[in-house]
From Swiss-Prot:
NCBIfam families: dGTP_triPase (TIGR01353), HDIG (TIGR00277), PRK01286.1-1 (NF002326), PRK01286.1-3 (NF002328). It comes from Bradyrhizobium sp. (strain ORS 278). The keyword Hydrolase applies. Coiled coil: none annotated. Residues 69-205 form the HD domain. Residues 1-32 are annotated as: Disordered. This is Deoxyguanosinetriphosphate triphosphohydrolase-like protein. The lineage of its organism: Bacteria, Pseudomonadati, Pseudomonadota, Alphaproteobacteria, Hyphomicrobiales.
Amino acid sequence: MSVGMAAPRAPYSCDPDRSRGRLFAEPPSRTRSPFRRDCDRVIHSTAFRRLKHKTQVFVFHEGDHYRTRLTHSLEVAQIARALARQLGLDEDLTETLALAHDLGHPPFGHAGERALNRCMADHGGFDHNAQTLRIVTAFEQRYPDFDGLNLTWESLEGIVKHNGPLQGPVPAGIAEFNARFDLELWSYASLEAQVAALADDIAYDAHDIDDGLRAGLFTVDDLKEVPLLAAIIAEIDRHYPSLDDIRRGAELVRELISYLIAAVAGEAERRIEQAKPVSPHDVRRHAGPLVAFPADVAEHEATIKAFLWQRMYRHERVMRVMRDAERIVADLFGRYQQDGATLPAGWLDGCGGEGERARRISHFIAGMTDRFALTEHHRLFDSTPDLR
């Protein structure tokens, strides 16, 4: 089948008419499938809107054209839908998982998560997937009959297990919810969830290249250090010998996304043909993931990540901002712990001990945007780093 063409619904896809349901029973919609309702609920959530002002790599005020968690999530959803369409999967469920996957991230990207995890080291740590689950099952308060978004079982398991079965210690927030609504943490997630996870990898690689070029951290010609990118650039230069670097970079990103989507789709089709699943049940109980990069492409993808690690994520300019961002998160956590009156009224009401107090504080900080975290730091401290 040509890439981009919609395949018929596959028997191993998640069928909305056979969903395992919601924690709180609801009458069916007359106009939308259960998975479409899930997707719409994510889009209309407060947490989703906050992603507009949460960092991907560059802090929110560095430029209007850099990616935020929101634009990244939209791009992941676009890639995920393309893959789902090719494989005959449920596009609405796939989109739900792509849009929801970053809801639990704290401000300042991975720097904020590292800082919050250190602050919570004595209380179980901080995990953004567990935080996402808390958001969609408790923290969003938009409906009269339940807290959270009351998503389907399939959406919840995909949020928790999109990177595979949970092995080793399970974050407390996930374990507690799993005791109420068994998400089969030991098994793989649906193909829709596996697609969303690979789409996240593709989006990261391609769009961090785009942002790094825009920021001047490296050039198109620098990217020739990566063999796969060198081959793509050579083809671009052969077809468009007079193209300026801005358009060369944009064409490189487009071609890379197309190449990776086709590679993942082809590998998934090969694995599915070998495994011969006839239901989502078979997918979940398979010995390994059915959606993945082919081995040679996985090597190329690792090389891209290594380049970005050295030339972008470890760039002194980025590192300086991230160190300051970590300090801001740690400062806020320490001040809130020291003086609970600096938190909004009622935030610590009914706390049962030091661990619960720390967890409440981590929830408050995790919900902040970059901008609000800076505003809070200005309010509580005499000196706040300039994240530029």
